[in-house]
Amino acid sequence: MAPPLPILIIGAGISGLTTARLLTNSGIPNIVFEASSPDRRQGFAISLREWGYATLLSALGDLPLRSLTRGVAPDREIGGSGWIDQAVWDNGTAKKLFVPDANSSTKEQIVRANRNALRRWIADCGEEELDVRYGHRLKRVEGSLGDVQVEFENGAFYRGLMVVAADGVNSTVRSQVLADVQPEIVPAVLYHGEFQLPRADFDRLFRPHTGESNILAGVGDGFNTPFAVCNMTKTHVHMDWSYSRPAWGSGENDPLYRPNLASEEAKRIPPALVEELASRDLAEPWSLFLNGEAIQHHRVFHWAVRCVSVTQEDMQRAVGRGIAFVGDSWHAMPIFGGEGGNHALADGVELAAAVAAGVAGDLGVAIGNYYDRAWKRSQDAVRRSKQRFYALHRPMAQWRELSQKKPV
């Protein structure tokens, strides 16, 4: 008797690896294909909300939260737990605007996770090693549920029961199966920088503001400048910063709103960014690192802010083709104000559970059940994330009004 066809997972990000790990733990054959090399760098940190990480820990056998934070927290090497205080600071005065009520019954616990470390941790949460094949960039996907075929640019060809599209906002699977679904560009400016500094300098410049928190959330008059710890050791701290704001007007006359930049151009620092940072009159520590001279020594990227939305009819079409979408491939959200990583975890957990329940019966019904559960959750989140992006970039007068209602 021929062995069962595997489930083919395109993309080794958070959603793809979560799906693969849980399928593997359930004894369901699967292969993960990743376009990049094993040493790809994506070491920035993301925020995991309680509902997101609790879902994952439960699916992995009710693991304790400490198991996760020991493996993924940016400050794990010095015994930290990825804690953030959720405080909001005025980046023009270096004064704290407000802190969410720590005693509130509605305050959700949030932990920071280094993205590279999170992928490794998920992959390692089981006795059987995952089958991840790097250097496989998808060329085409054909067939239907029960017998799908995928071909890669390196000439490799595979057949499987179904395809899990975990290939991100610019999903190749989606472009072939749901060609009419295109990412929506949010009219926003977002620059991201990475730098490293000695631990002693971090303790001197940042600790007076952050304490043990892994984020220093600075806001200005319609713009944001958060600092975040990506990885911390006893001697050095790898950090990142972001500079973000809504585009001016339609964006046509905004020198920093450039949503269609080529990848190499997106790594260059435009003079307009240097000029704009200089005009912001930032207080320390923001002014020490967000200036024209300092950022020349940082790895700086321009990030286009994109969203992806789908209809229930789109998902029904995908079921017939044997495609299950997870993560940003079907619900990309703005980096600021979004909860994409949390929904990626939830997708992987819910899809793996649905497939495990239906693989011996009607797999189409199983995928349909997954979409029925996940569609509203994720698509509502896409809509909320766009609204939250603008709320997080409000005028300073509104921030100060909020601070009167939520005093420090």
UniProtKB/Swiss-Prot annotation:
Keyword Flavoprotein appears in the UniProt entry: yes
Molecular function via GO: FAD binding; monooxygenase activity
Keyword list, A-Z: FAD, Flavoprotein, Glycoprotein, Monooxygenase, Oxidoreductase, Signal
Key word Plastid present: no
Pathway(s) per entry: Secondary metabolite biosynthesis
Signal peptide from the UniProt entry: 1-20
Residues bound to FAD: E34, A45, R119, D328, G341
EC number from the UniProt entry: 1.-.-.-
Glycosylated residues in this chain: N91, N103, N170, N231
Pfam families to which the protein is assigned, alphabetical: FAD_binding_3
Cofactor(s) listed in the protein's UniProt record: FAD
Task of the protein: FAD-dependent monooxygenase; part of the gene cluster that mediates the biosynthesis of neosartoricin, a prenylated anthracenone that exhibits T-cell antiproliferative activity, suggestive of a physiological role as an immunosuppressive agent. The non-reducing polyketide synthase nscA probably synthesizes and cyclizes the decaketide backbone. The hydrolase nscB then mediates the product release through hydrolysis followed by spontaneous decarboxylation. The prenyltransferase nscD catalyzes the addition of the dimethylallyl group to the aromatic C5.
Protein family: Belongs to the paxM FAD-dependent monooxygenase family.
Name of the protein in question: FAD-dependent monooxygenase nscC
Organism the protein comes from: Neosartorya fischeri (strain ATCC 1020 / DSM 3700 / CBS 544.65 / FGSC A1164 / JCM 1740 / NRRL 181 / WB 181) (Aspergillus fischerianus)
Gene from which the chain derives: nscC
